[in-house]
Every structure is written in C-alpha cells, then in structure tokens.
C-alpha cells in the first residue's frame, strides 16, 4: 500500500495535472489540499482538452472519489461552473464521488475586488496575482475573519458574519482603495443560492480520508502551484498565499505525516514562471521564444505568456530537500527536440562567490548569475517513444544528468501532452 503526494518542484505549471491523471488509475481517493482557482490543470484525453481549476483531475476517471480539502479556498461560482461543464460532457454522473470539506474557506466578492485593486495600485511592485481573490481570502482565514462552507450553508450564521465583515471590507474598498462598496443584500442572495448547490457536496472530509486510510485505500494528494511559490519557502513576496510544499498535505487535508509514503515532485525539462519575481535562467532571446511556442507556454488560468528558461538544478535540489522528494516526474522533454545544444544551470554565483543554495532575499536572488554546462541536443521526434531505451542517446544522457544534479531518481518522463505519451520508470503506487 502507498499513499502519494504530488507537488510542483518549480514555479508551478509543471504538468501536475497530467501526472495526477496517470497516477489516478492506481488511487481510490484524489485529494486537493491547498490553493484555489488561481491554478489550472490542463489534461488531454484523446483529442479533447480539459481544463480544471478547482475540481481534482481524478474526476475524469470513473469510480474515484475526489475531495477538495480544508486547505483549499473555494470560489462557489467557479466550482459550480466546473460541475455543470463536467455533467454536460457526461464526466460527472455521481455527485457522491465529489466532496467538499465543511471547513474550507469561501472566496467572497470583496476578496476579488480587493485583490484586483491592490495589484492595480502596486505600480512596479506588482506580485503578479491572478486577481481571483485567493490572497485576501487566506488573509481572512488567518485573521479569523473568514467564512467557511459550513457558515455559508447556515443562512443565519452567514448573514450575521457577512454583515459584520462587510463593514471593514467596504471601509477598505472606499477609503483606502478608492473603489465602490460591495452590496450586502446582493451578496447575501447570490451566495445563498450557491449554498443550495454546494450542500450536496459538503462533508467532514478529514474523517472520510482517515477512515479510507484505515481501510487500506490508496490516496493521491494533488498539489497546486509549485515549491518556489510556497508562502514560507518560495521567492517571497512573489509567492502564493498557501503552503504548496509537501508539508501542506497534512494541514490542508487533515492527515498525519506517517500516512504519506511517496512524494513526487513534478518538473519540466526546462523552467517557466508566470508573474513577477526572480528567475536566474530566464531567456530573453530566440531560445526563450522557441520554448514558449513549442511548449504552448501560456497560463491555463490567466492566458498570460510564461517566462521561459533553461533547467535550473539549484531550484530542483531545493525542492528535493524542502519536500523530501522520493521521485521526480519530468515533463515536456519533447519540447527540447530540435535544439542543437541544451544548457543546464548547475549553480549560482553572487558577487563572484558560489552559492550552496537559493538566497532567501529576493534582491539577492535577482542578482544571482547562473553557472551553465552545455549538453548536445537531439533532432528526433520523441513524442512516440514508449520506453526510455527508445529515446535518442543525447535525450537519455540529458535525463540522466538532471537526475544526477537533482540527487533524486526520475520516475516518469513525459514526451507529449496525451496520457499515452508517457514513459513510467517506476510507479510510486506499486
């Protein structure tokens, strides 16, 4: 028996959705434990592309229980739209296979309004927020001013808490951000309508997950964003507002750490980042444009073009250490086909001195200079490779070198967007 956590090993957008989709076959429950609809998973099933922002990727498999845990912040409108779309396509036929934690926090209209207004006033200090209200919702959770799902489903409690909190939120919007206030009656009616839909999905998910663990079922924990966006261990302040690392599994789902047997970090064969913040290997030349175009590097949530750069072994070693990774799933190796040579960042220098790890201060991180080694590329189309041995010699050498630099075994190699374009070297569930 194995329970597996999936986390991003870079700055998000590493291809977690595809890997989760593959591993779902071996799991009974798929659990999201942090984040909100600021992340998007893009899955290609046959010739169909499916983009999910809240509902776990496992929903595309019949007979699997998908759980959105207490560590997630939920936009009811987005969740309901995803449900409707899945039902219309015949992919959600049993509501009992999708559960929401009664303790998760609800994103309110004022969270989104505040998020957008703050970013607009930030000038050249923009974080790069998606404007979905994620950060302000987590602020209220920590400040004990949040509205949980269980509160939303009790109209009297919801009305009282909304009225209390809206006084402060409207003061902030009007007096400090120069925005129009939110309307109490409008929010009350709109969200009371959402509550009736959400009621069918609410449960004590921590209890359910632990009961399933006791029964010997296999759990797959699905992370969002990436290690370098973690609120504590990421490139602060250019981070998200939740714990994206493996430690967030426990607090975001209600399970103890002894139940997590494998932690798989997802990494592209190069690096991308959306929004502001340090990125030592970022490319501003034709190679960067080529990676962006070949990899389709545009955000599934925002549509923004992603910043692209060469593989950064410093980042991956940091992710291995911070998460305790037991394996790495390497995605988008096929995007590198056609490059005459490929660079790998093996270390950084700062003011002429070699660094042992990533600097904590963003100002120092911004000034880091990457140290590169160069490997020969390959011209063959590898998207049809079914085994590691079928890859060109230089592609195999590249993967092996990344594994050496990471200090962690590569357990999966993705050579295309489809499920069947995957080489599994070791299955963490078996």
UniProtKB/Swiss-Prot annotation:
It is found in: Cytoplasm. IMP binds at residues 13-16, 38-41, 130, 144, 225, 240, 304. Disulfide bonds: none annotated. SUPFAM superfamilies: P-loop containing nucleoside triphosphate hydrolases (SSF52540). GO terms for biological process: 'de novo' AMP biosynthetic process; IMP metabolic process. The active site is at 13 (proton acceptor), 41 (proton donor). It catalyses: IMP + L-aspartate + GTP = N(6)-(1,2-dicarboxyethyl)-AMP + GDP + phosphate + 2 H(+). One of its GO terms (molecular function) is magnesium ion binding. The keyword Cytoplasm applies. This is Adenylosuccinate synthetase. It is an enzyme of class 6 (ligase). It comes from Pelobacter propionicus (strain DSM 2379 / NBRC 103807 / OttBd1). It holds the Pfam family Adenylsucc_synt. The keyword GTP-binding applies.
């Amino acid at each position: 028996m194995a329970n597996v956590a999936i986390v991003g090993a870079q700055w998000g957008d590493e291809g977690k959705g595809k890997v989760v989709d593959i591993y779902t076959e071996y799991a009974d429950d798929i659990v999201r434990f942090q984040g909100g609809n600021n992340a998007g998973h893009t899955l290609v099933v046959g010739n169909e592309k499916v983009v999910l922002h809240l509902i776990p990727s496992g929903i595309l498999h019949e007979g699997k229980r998908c759980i959105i845990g207490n560590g997630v912040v939920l936009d009811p409108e987005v969740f309901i739209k995803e449900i409707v779309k899945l039902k219309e396509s015949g992919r959600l036929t049993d509501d009992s296979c999708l559960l929401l934690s009664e303790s998760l926090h609800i994103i309110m209209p004022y969270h989104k309004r505040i998020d957008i207004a703050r970013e607009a006033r930030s000038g050249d200090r923009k974080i790069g927020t998606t404007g979905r209200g994620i950060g302000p919702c987590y602020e209220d959770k920590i400040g004990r001013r949040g509205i949980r799902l269980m509160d939303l489903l009790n109209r009297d409690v919801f009305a009282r808490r909304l009225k209390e909190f809206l006084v402060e939120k409207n003061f902030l919007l009007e007096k400090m951000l120069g925005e129009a206030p939110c309307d109490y009656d409008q929010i009350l009616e709109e969200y009371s309508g959402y509550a009736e839909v959400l009621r069918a999905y609410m449960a004590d998910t921590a209890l359910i997950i632990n009961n399933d663990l006791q029964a010997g079922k296999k759990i797959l924990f699905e992370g969002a964003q990436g290690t370098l966006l973690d609120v504590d261990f990421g490139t602060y302040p250019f981070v998200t507002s939740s714990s994206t690392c493996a430690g967030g599994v426990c607090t975001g789902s209600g399970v103890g750490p002894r139940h997590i047997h494998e932690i798989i970090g997802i990494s592209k064969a190069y690096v991308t980042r959306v929004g502001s913040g340090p990125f030592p290997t970022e490319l501003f030349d034709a190679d960067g444009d080529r990676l962006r175009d070949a990899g389709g590097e545009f955000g599934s949530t925002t549509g923004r073009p992603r910043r692209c750069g060469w593989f950064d072994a410093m980042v991956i070693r940091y992710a291995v250490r911070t998460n305790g990774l037991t394996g790495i799933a390497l995605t988008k190796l096929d995007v590198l086909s056609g490059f005459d040579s490929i660079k790998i960042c093996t270390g950084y220098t700062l003011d002429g001195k070699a660094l042992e790890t990533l600097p904590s201060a963003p100002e120092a991180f911004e000034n880091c200079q990457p140290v590169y080694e160069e490997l020969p590329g390959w011209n063959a189309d590898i998207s049809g490779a079914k085994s590691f041995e079928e890859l060109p010699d230089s592609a195999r050498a590249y993967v092996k070198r990344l594994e050496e630099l990471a200090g962690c075994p590569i357990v999966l190699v993705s050579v295309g967007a489809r499920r069947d374009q995957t080489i599994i070297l070791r299955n963490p569930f078996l």
